[in-house]
Every structure is written in C-alpha cells, then in structure tokens.
C-alpha cells in the first residue's frame, strides 16, 4: 500500500514537471507559435468565406482601363506563330529571368525538348520562356543583345518591357494568359512553371491525354495551398500589407512552381484579369483571386510538388509530375527519371509492395516537407 502511494505521488510529480516544461516552452515561444499556428488555424476557419463569396473580388475590382495598365507592356521579343495550324496538347510557359541562360539550355535539352516530345510521345507540346528585362539597367543593352541571339537560335522567348523582379511576378502571369489568349487559345491545356522546376513530361503527357479523352473542363490542378494566411511581417519576402489585402486568409491556390489549367479555364482567367487589381504581387494568390471570379477551384494532384525537391528514387520517378528547386541537376534527373531502371519497377505484387514501402519511408515524415504528401505513397 505504501509502495503504491509512492508510485502515485511519483507519477503526479512527473506529470506536473512535464506540464511545467511544456508551459515554459510555450511562454518562451508564444509569439512564434501564435504566428505559425494560431494564424493558420484562424485563416483556415476563414477560408470558407473567401472561397464561397465574391466580396474579395469586389474589393479588388478595377475598371478595364486600370486593369489594362498592368498588362499592356510592349513586347521586346516574341514569336506569334508558335501554335499556328497545330493541334497543341499543351502550351508550356516557363517563367524565366533574362540571365538564366543555363537553366533554359538545360530545359531545352531535357524535358522541354519539343522534338523528343513529338517523336517519342506523339503529341505537340510548345515550350516558351516568359520574362521581363534585367533590373540592373547598367548591363541592359548587353543582356538584350545576348537574348536576341538566343531568340534567333531557338525562337522561344516571350519578353515584355517590365522589370523582371519578384514584385512583378503577377505581371509575368498576365503576360502568359494574355499571350495565350492572343496566340494559342486553341491549346487543350496551359501549364505555368518556374525555370528551376523539373517536369516529367512523359508522365505529364499521359495524364493530359487521359484528361483530353474525357473532355475534361474547369481543370486547375497542382499542389494546392488551402487557408494560407497573409504574411504580415515586414521583413518577409512574402509580406502582404493590410491595405493591399485585409482578409485573414488567401483563397485556395496552387503553388506557382508548376500547375496546369484546361483551355477553357485559361480563357476564363484571362477574362478575370481584365477587371482585377494586379498590384497583388504574389502571383499564386492573384491566380486564386482570378479563379474565384472565374468560378474555378484548384484540384490537388499528389505528384505536383510544392516548393520542395522530391526524393530521388525510381519508385518516385515512376509517377512524378513536377519537382521544384533544380538549378543544376536537371540533366542528371532527366536521365535518371526516364531511364530503363524506372520502367516496370512497381509491376507485380512484390514490386507494388516494394515501392509502397520505399515511398512511405521517403514521403511520410513527421514534419512538413512541402513536396509530395504522404498520400502519394498509397497511389
């Protein structure tokens, strides 16, 4: 009896000690916890209103003349006949910057190689690079001369006369949808991707061919962010002033690193941009605002990555669509992801069990990775 009482007292003491430790950590880190947890809980509870009603669009609506001011920059480099007289399955816009020549070359020789896509996959995919002008005006003339040479060699640069900076990403989005509307409106699908994104084009083409055969409409697919709160810290790259966006939650949107819309959605988004305030410089969020106006909701695809780089493994390559953060290894990954070692790796019962175990190990982490979710391990 005496021993039992001692055990009970010891257990209560340990509980009290643990609670004190937890409370101490919370008190020290409360500001951090409040920002990253409480704000997310608060914004997620608010997202239903944002996604269900149009008051957000009314607050950001502008006249057609005002909207045109954001997307009326003159073209410096262009090629209007890219899609002419072609049955284009996919128009793929790569968001690049003037100085990223090596990235563009890597893309042209791997997943963006139109000849490979036509010969090996039997479809027409047109790849073009969207950009503004170099912010540093001191080297502007030299850079433009190099870009003209590049364009003469490859005929795939779409450049407008705006400063190519983070705060002009929405202007680059407007460029993409305007150019599509004017020059490639008949494309079945439109994709927007960063120039440090790896795209497994064979997997993407097979996926889109299946959707095309089903005559899918109202498609906007990618890695979906739901209930994300605006960042109010001034020192953040993603800082959002209250006077620009006063709501507690952003509308649902896909990660701007890579997403796909069907042709009808591309047309609707373009129309939405004609009456919305594009000074919202976070292009992913602006896309979500346009989608509300267009009556379109984003769809999650577990093999579109967020901001993170996906694990390297044949079991991942077999179904991957995009992976983000590849500045110098695109050629290596292309060779690895499309090589013979990937084909049939999950065939048969043992193959399925093996790849399921591998993907669970690589993807099901107890912390946030911003790449494929754990759900991808079970598909």
UniProtKB/Swiss-Prot annotation:
One annotated GO biological process: protein O-linked glycosylation
Topology of this chain in the membrane: Single-pass type II membrane protein
Domain of life: Eukaryota
Reported induction: Hedgehog signaling is required for expression in embryonic lens.
GO molecular function, one term: lactosylceramide 1,3-N-acetyl-beta-D-glucosaminyltransferase activity
Keyword field: Glycoprotein, Glycosyltransferase, Golgi apparatus, Lipid metabolism, Membrane, Signal-anchor, Transferase, Transmembrane, Transmembrane helix
EC number: 2.4.1.206
Catalysed conversion reaction: a beta-D-Gal-(1->4)-beta-D-Glc-(1<->1)-Cer(d18:1(4E)) + UDP-N-acetyl-alpha-D-glucosamine = a beta-D-GlcNAc-(1->3)-beta-D-Gal-(1->4)-beta-D-Glc-(1<->1)-Cer(d18:1(4E)) + UDP + H(+); a neolactoside nLc4Cer(d18:1(4E)) + UDP-N-acetyl-alpha-D-glucosamine = a neolactoside IV(3)-beta-GlcNAc-nLc4Cer(d18:1(4E)) + UDP + H(+)
Subcellular location: Golgi apparatus membrane
Pathway the protein takes part in: Protein modification; protein glycosylation
Segments on the Lumenal side according to the record's topology features: 31-379
Segments in the Cytoplasmic topological domain: 1-12
UniProt keyword Transferase, yes or no: yes
Glycan attachment residues as annotated in the record: 57, 113, 168, 277
GO cellular component: Golgi membrane
Functional note: Beta-1,3-N-acetylglucosaminyltransferase that plays a key role in the synthesis of lacto- or neolacto-series carbohydrate chains on glycolipids.
Similarity remark: Belongs to the glycosyltransferase 31 family.
Full protein name: Lactosylceramide 1,3-N-acetyl-beta-D-glucosaminyltransferase A
Naturally occurring in which organism (per UniProt): Danio rerio (Zebrafish)
């Amino acid at each position: 009896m005496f021993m039992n009482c001692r055990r009970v007292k010891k257990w209560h003491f340990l509980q009290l000690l643990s609670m004190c430790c937890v409370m101490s950590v919370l008190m020290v880190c409360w500001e951090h916890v409040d920002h990253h947890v409480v704000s997310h809980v608060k914004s997620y509870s608010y997202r239903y209103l944002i996604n269900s009603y149009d008051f957000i669009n009314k607050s950001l609506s502008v006249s057609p003349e005002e909207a045109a001011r954001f997307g009326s920059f003159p073209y410096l480099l262009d090629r209007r006949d890219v899609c002419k007289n072609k049955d284009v399955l996919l128009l793929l816009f790569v968001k690049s910057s003037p100085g990223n020549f090596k990235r563009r070359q890597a893309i042209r020789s791997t997943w963006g190689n139109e000849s490979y896509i036509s010969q090996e996959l039997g479809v027409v995919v047109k790849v073009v690079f969207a950009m503004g002008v170099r912010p540093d005006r001191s080297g502007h003339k030299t850079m433009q001369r190099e870009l003209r040479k590049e364009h003469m060699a490859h005929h795939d640069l779409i450049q407008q006369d705006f400063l190519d900076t983070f705060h002009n990403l929405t202007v680059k989005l407007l460029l993409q949808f305007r150019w599509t509307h004017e020059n490639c409106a008949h494309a079945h699908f439109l994709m927007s991707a960063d120039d440090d994104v790896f795209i497994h084009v064979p997997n993407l083409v097979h996926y889109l061919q299946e959707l095309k055969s089903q005559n899918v409409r109202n498609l906007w697919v990618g890695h979906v962010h739901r209930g994300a709160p605006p960042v109010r810290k001034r020192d953040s790259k993603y800082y959002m002033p209250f006077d620009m966006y006063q709501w507690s939650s952003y509308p649902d949107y896909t990660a701007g690193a890579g997403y796909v819309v069907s042709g009808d959605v591309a047309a609707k988004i373009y129309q939405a941009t004609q009456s919305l305030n594009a000074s919202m410089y976070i292009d992913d969020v602006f896309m979500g605002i346009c989608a509300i106006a267009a009556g379109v909701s984003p769809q999650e695809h577990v093999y579109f990555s967020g901001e993170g780089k996906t694990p390297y493994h044949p079991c991942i390559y077999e179904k991957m669509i995009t992976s983000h953060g590849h500045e110098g290894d695109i050629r290596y990954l292309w060779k690895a992801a499309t090589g013979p070692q990937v084909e049939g790796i999950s065939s048969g019962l043992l193959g399925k069990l093996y790849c399921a175990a591998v993907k669970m190990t690589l993807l099901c982490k107890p912390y946030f990775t911003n790449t494929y979710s754990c759900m991808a391990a079970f598909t």
